Amino acid sequence: MTSIDFDQYARDYASLIAEQTEAFDSDNDYFVRYKVDRLQSIAPHARSILDFGCGVGRSIPFLRAAYPQAEIIGSDPSAESLAFARKTNPKETFVPLNELGAETRYDVIFAACVFHHIAPEIRDETLAFCRERLAPGGRIVIFEHNPLNPVTQRLVNTCPFDADAVLLGKGETAARLKRAGLEIDKSGYCLFFPGALAALRPLERRLQWLPLGGQYFVSGKSPAA
């Protein structure tokens, strides 16, 4: 799925992320909380969630808090990342990506900053893989770095585990979800204001049309049965 060996970064992943994002917000959990909060606003009643490309499982505690009754599965190709995720989230379930069968269907497949690590030529194939595991009426919700934001570009260019990154814009993500047979029902730009301007963050949802946010999200919904 990616040319970067995330096994070598699993132990130090959290500290590396903190170093990269400290200038934006010293509370590194803010980025994870933000995505899960936005996910919950898009799909408030999900009963089963796949954290696709879960890495070391940083989103899992926030997903569990937002969806206390849901079945939540984390999946990733990195064995070391999954081992770390299991250690820090011992009550949750993690499955290697190559063992993720199509017999289980999910209401939500959540992919947070995963697809820029996937080579462009296999992105459609990867979305088809996800689509096969989506329940009728379910959603694939993708968060990605916004290539139109120069600060985002700089952060990606200086991040050691983004060496393979090929950023994809919101339009590309939406088009690929459509090719996978999904209807785009929600999308927007996000993460506009750093911690120093946190008082302005309530304005974010009014600005989601503006292509200057540090990241963006796109939700593709499958037809109901």
What are these regions (language model features)?
Residues 137-144:
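Conserved beta-strand signature within the Rossmann-like core of class I S-adenosyl-L-methionine
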Residues 110:
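A conserved beta-strand element that flanks and buttresses the S-adenosyl-L-methionine
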Residues 146-163:
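Short, glycine-/aromatic-enriched active-site segment of Class I SAM-dependent methyltransferases
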Residues 58-99:
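Class I SAM-dependent methyltransferase SAM/SAH-binding core
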Residues 124-136:
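A short glycine-rich, Lys/Arg-flanked "PGG" loop and its adjoining helix->strand segment in the class I
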